[in-house]
Design a protein with these regions (language model features):
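Contiguous interface-forming segments/domains that mediate binding rather than catalysis
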Residues: 2-23, 62-65, 96-106, 121-129
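An acidic intrinsically disordered interaction segment
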Residues: 2-32, 78-88, 110
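A charged, amphipathic interaction segment
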Residues: 92-153
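Short runs of predominantly hydrophobic/aromatic residues within well-ordered alpha helices
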Residues: 20-23, 46-50, 114, 131-134
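Structured binding/interaction patches within domain cores
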Residues: 60-117
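Short alpha-helical "patches" and their helix-cap loops
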Residues: 40-43, 63-79, 129-133, 153
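N-terminal interaction modules that seed assembly of large macromolecular complexes
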Residues: 32-70
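Amphipathic alpha-helical segments within well-ordered protein domains
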Residues: 39, 54, 87-88, 118-122
Length: 153
């Protein structure tokens, strides 16, 4: 009985998780403060939205298994990555307005990806505990000694 009470007290309720809009705004602020550092994660093969989510979960003390979030990434990266590549390749051939339109669409795809990650997160049984999500992710990328190391909780 005591173990059940302990488990119930440590379990994270869905309402404690970030909302899509709240997380989008938080991500924009955190990303904007150190955009180049977050882009370094991307250049090392990582996903910025995932890294931001893992950092946010660390701040909340919620550990998560990266493999549980992988399907959401696979689903959204199938659309996002080709669009990003197309935008980058077209940059020199487009006028400012056309390029900004492509960039705005990419940001909408980024927002969609965040929403899918959060939706996936809401389906998981999450518990409070020692959360080193960002550290583990950066370690997988070989980037744990990079510019974001000070964010590791």
């Amino acid at each position: 009985m005591r173990d059940e009470q302990l488990m119930a007290s440590e379990r994270v309720a869905v309402h404690e998780l970030p909302t899509p809009l709240g997380f989008w705004h938080w991500s924009g602020k955190v990303y904007g403060e150190r955009s180049q550092d977050w882009l370094d994660v991307q250049s090392q093969g990582g996903n910025v939205n995932l890294a931001l989510l893992l950092h946010h979960l660390d701040l909340l003390g919620i550990p998560v298994d990266l493999t549980d979030l992988q399907p959401a990434l696979v689903q959204t990266e199938a659309v996002l990555l080709p669009w990003r590549t197309l935008r980058q390749q077209a940059k020199s051939r487009l006028g400012t307005e056309e390029y900004q339109t492509m960039l705005a669409h990419e940001l909408e795809l980024e927002r969609l990806q965040q929403g899918v990650l959060l939706q996936t997160l809401r389906t998981l049984a999450l518990f409070r505990g020692d959360s080193r999500n960002l550290f583990h992710y950066l370690s997988l990328l070989g980037a744990q000694q990079g510019p974001l190391r000070d964010l590791i909780c």
